[in-house]
Amino acid sequence: MRTLLLPLCLAVALVGCDSTDTGEPPADGAQRFRVEIANVAPAFGVLKSGTFDTPVGAAQPGPIFPGDAYEISFTAGPNVTPGSGMRFSFATMFIQSNDLFYTFPADGLALYDAQGRARTGDVTGELVLYDAGTEVNEAPGAGPNQAPRQSGPDTGTPENGVLGRIDDGQPDRAGFTYPDRADVIRVTLDHDGETAFTVRIENVSTGATLPTPDGGSVAVPLSPGGWAVHVDAVDFFASGQPASGGIEAIAEDGSPGALAGELGPLTGVTVPLSPGTAAVHTSDVRFFQGGAAASEGIEAIAEDGSPGALTAALQSVTGIREAVSFTTPEGAAAPAPIGPGGSYAFEVDAVPGDRLSFATMYIQSNDLYLSFAGEGLPLFSGQTPVSGDVSDQVRLYDAGTERDQEPGVGLDQAPRQAGPDTGAAEGGTITRVVGTDDGFSYAAPAEVVRVTVTPIGG
């Protein structure tokens, strides 16, 4: 798969650009700190992946024969970042061959149209029969090194070729011809009206589908395979290039395990971080109160990545020394979220006894945010300024203001929501998220954000 550099143009949905940081020298006796909030999460090009190996109605894994089908169910929204689109790919072996497989084109099948409507119905017309180029082709339905007749997996003469498509009615590199795709396989797509899809892969071949050199004919079984839901900037395979080990294992032997191993490390939810609010305050101020309802400012960050309300509200709170909105990524010219590798930085002043608090939205969620505990992070140990990586003090919180949906999929999450403050109200309280408290899985804070505090000057 090609490496993905995810676009993160979420500024339309995630707004807020005010700041009370004056840039003036620190007051007498105050220590200036530089604070960097960096996104250290990985960028994933694949949202979901897996294998299919058990025919519908069967109790054990196996190929599908005429009349049999596999089904694959998954959830996916229209995008994971603005401008991206979600696609589906799979691979299943044309078993009466040496190394042929059915799939969609390398960039996959679009799951949504340009208007964001889910695709449904028969999509067989978009399938392609590919030659993996890994084993020399023999007469289809008769070769001794083909899956039904070979002595074991990975037999046959290596070809050392590249992936190439075989269109209906066209011969392969060795001059052999194959049935039209619609005479062997039918693929249909169903959608539940929200985010759930079911792909059905049916074997529609018959005993007369594939003529053999002896004048007879055979059906074409289809093998277990692998699948992925991925963004449109990522290819499932590289046409014209050598096949990966995972594609080779399916195309030659109908074995999906190696492809699952290749897809696994590429699969996950990319987590951008939003503009946010930071404050320096005394020890008797709490940035938020766990177990209590979220303030409007915390809600605006947790749901929409908008820090303006919280920054403004803090101005009238006794014990707040300084409040700032961090909105513009380092190296950027305009406010925006930060994707993997991006960072925000700002400077604040503090005296011994002061604490630092901040909040930034965990964007692939409905109302989650990253922060220190409500009492904040002490900026001094006695009279000595804190210095270095303080990421181990960061927590993930649920604001309790909007019902949670599956991360990276929910239609009321930025960047998929229709606008700010959408989604069903929860009426809950702020809770720390650990593990799968809400039924969903989230990356640990240290896997997403790195917060570094650096004293400036003497």
Locate predicted features:
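An exposed acidic His-Trp-rich patch
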Residues: 99-149, 367-416
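Structured domain cores in non-transmembrane regions
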Residues: 26-120, 194-196, 205-374
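Sec-dependent signal peptide recognition
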Residues: 1-8
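Activation corresponds to long, low-complexity, non-globular regions
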Residues: 137-191, 404-458
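C-terminal motif of bacterial Sec signal peptides marking the signal peptidase cleavage site
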Residues: 13-16
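Bacterial signal peptide processing site
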Residues: 18-21
